[in-house]
From Swiss-Prot:
Residues 43-62, 113-118, 171-184, 321-330, 380-381, 445-452 are extracellular. This is Monocarboxylate transporter 7. GO terms for biological process: monocarboxylic acid transport. GO terms for cellular component: basolateral plasma membrane; membrane; plasma membrane. The lineage of its organism: Eukaryota, Metazoa, Chordata, Craniata, Vertebrata. The modification Phosphoserine is found at residues 234, 237, 240, 247. Residues 1-21, 84-91, 140-149, 206-299, 352-358, 403-423, 474-523 are cytoplasmic. It is a multi-pass membrane protein. Keywords: Cell membrane, Membrane, Phosphoprotein, Transmembrane, Transmembrane helix, Transport. Belongs to the major facilitator superfamily. Monocarboxylate porter (TC 2.A.1.13) family. The chain crosses the membrane at residues 22-42, 63-83, 92-112, 119-139, 150-170, 185-205, 300-320, 331-351, 359-379, 382-402, 424-444, 453-473. The gene is SLC16A6. It comes from Homo sapiens (Human). Forms functional complexes with BSG/CD147 or EMB/GP70 ancillary proteins.
Length: 523
């Protein structure tokens, strides 16, 4: 019985279409808890901030480099996680990530210098966070289609519940056993990533019929078309002057067309070529870097990262600097996390509605998030910080749970390139992940005012809004250029047309001065 259960969890799922459920619900639960033990811990790390400053006698900017290096490694190694996932499978990579995360956090609890934490949490755990998070969110997107936005949004609330629960719990635990043993406990707790990673069964989408049946059906359809084509074309040729002959083989699925000029006739040779899907897919597709819409979206992620992590790191020190006790300051972080839950779920429901331009909803949320970051600089007491925390938490939730799944939308790259796009996108975010927290810490060290840390966050988010606003125009501009280029090629006789979709090929059959001879040749 146990062996059957293990076999059930290990074999791949094969579907004829995107299931929008099935084992995907187990994957969604796994993603929830992976979020708990990855981003949930990263965002809760602010509770150790003052303890580390006192123990190592270091400045804000020096301590902030711990999370900065961690986020940098997390995002910088995203292409590596993509390659390993495509090569060895998502399950093994996530389980390896869980081991690395736990090892780094446990080693950090024995650190005697802040540089030791740079290696333990920054590099080792950072690499583990990437191996754990990215493959999980990628495979979750493959299990869901219509429900992708809402499922991802709800599952991503794991980090919010983690911050809500861990922030006060770790504060209480530190008072009893100290920050080192508390960090050790967190590291052992993160071993659960290995368990939930084991639930990530791979998914394969194939056609509803076997290849043999499809070939037979194609041959029957081709034969039927051949029998009826003579009658139809003989009638059409009276008006259009088109003469059509076809070979008795199955109709090709992918065509190359070549126009050869004649005295009063153009001959269109249609040759079959292998399906694109039969070619071996690259482990990492860098062709997405040629799409201007993706470049703009990646720049959006780059600048937005400046405002993602610093607020959660500095909200507790900011509250303490304003005379708020530690317990109430920790409650600010918990409140921010709960507001983020509602933001993620709300965004999921809104983006799940059809039809809707999801990129525009995201843009509105980014603008409001920029406003919330500026609002922190004007707060002077507990309830002002509470209001800002709720507003910020809700708005960051609308973006945090949707900015990666939004890559699967046609406005950006589409679901076919989702895996490679996610790896490159998070890789580009690494620059801001490295610079964000130290930049905020530098502003604090120079001014001795914690609210100044939010200026860099707000400035980065404002630039992110500008880049996001350019995504849709860039996509439309590319499409228009693509159409005009194809029209020019078709209009010139004697030119070679390669890899042109049939939908874009228009022939003027009304002209009698040209006769078109169509010949279909077998492979």
């Amino acid at each position: 019985m146990t062996q059957n259960k293990l076999k059930l969890c290990s074999k791949a799922n094969v579907y004829t279409e995107v299931p929008d459920g099935g084992w995907g619900w187990a994957v969604a639960v796994s993603f929830f808890f992976v979020e708990v033990f990855t981003y949930g811990i990263i965002k809760t790390f602010g509770v150790f901030f003052n303890d580390l400053m006192d123990s190592f006698n270091e400045s804000n900017s020096r301590i902030s480099w711990i999370i900065s290096i961690c986020v940098f490694v997390l995002t910088f190694s995203a292409p590596l996680a993509t390659v390993l996932s495509n090569r060895f499978g998502h399950r093994l990579v996530v389980m390896l990530g869980g081991l690395l995360v736990s090892t780094g956090m446990v080693a950090a609890s024995f650190s005697q210098e802040v540089s030791h934490m740079y290696v333990a949490i920054g590099i080792i755990s950072g690499l583990g966070y990437c191996f754990s998070f990215l493959p999980t969110v990628t495979i979750l997107s493959q299990y869901f289609g219509k429900r992708r936005s809402i499922v991802t949004a709800v599952a991503s609330t794991g980090e919010c519940f983690a911050v809500f629960a861990f922030a006060p719990a770790i504060m209480a635990l530190k008072e009893r056993i100290g920050w080192r043993y508390s960090l050790l406990f967190v590291g052992l707790l993160q071993l659960n990533i290995v368990i939930f990673g084991a639930l990530l069964r791979p998914i394969f989408i194939r056609g509803p019929a076997s290849p043999k049946i499809v070939i037979q059906e194609n041959r029957k359809e081709a034969q039927y078309m051949l029998e009826n084509e003579k009658t139809r074309t003989s009638i059409d040729s009276i008006d259009s002057g088109v003469e059509l002959t076809t070979s008795p083989k199955n109709v090709p699925t992918h065509t190359n067309l070549e126009l050869e000029p004649k005295a009063d006739m153009q001959q269109v040779l249609v040759k079959t070529s292998p399906r694109p899907s039969e070619k071996k897919a690259p482990l990492l597709d860098f062709s997405i870097l040629k799409e201007k819409s993706f470049i703009c979206y990646a720049l959006f992620g780059l600048f937005a990262t400046l405002g993602f992590f610093a607020p959660s790191l500095y909200i507790i020190p900011l509250g303490i600097s304003l005379g708020i006790d530690q317990d109430r300051a920790a409650f600010l972080l918990s409140t921010m996390a709960i507001a983020e839950v509602f933001g993620r779920i709300g965004a999921g429901f809104v983006l799940n509605r059809e039809p809707i331009r999801k990129i525009y909803i995201e843009l509105i949320c980014v603008i409001l998030l920029t406003v919330s970051l500026f609002a922190f600089t004007f707060a002077t007491e507990f309830w002002g910080l509470m209001s800002c925390s709720i507003f910020f938490g809700f708005m960051v939730g609308t973006i945090g749970g949707t900015h990666i799944p939004l890559l699967a939308e046609d406005d950006v790259v589409g679901i076919e390139k989702m895996s490679s796009a996610a790896g490159v996108y998070i890789f580009i975010q690494s620059i801001a992940g490295l610079a964000g927290p130290p930049l905020a810490g530098l502003l604090v060290d120079q001014s001795k005012i914690y609210s100044r840390a939010f200026y860099s966050c707000a400035a980065g988010m404002a630039l992110a809004a500008v880049c996001l606003a350019l995504v849709r125009p860039c996509k439309m501009g590319l499409c228009q250029h693509h159409h005009s280029g194809e029209t020019k090629v078709v209009s010139h006789r004697g030119k070679t047309l390669q890899d042109i979709p049939e939908d874009f090929l228009e022939m003027d059959l009304a002209k009698n001065e040209h006769r078109v001879h169509v010949q279909m040749e077998p492979v």
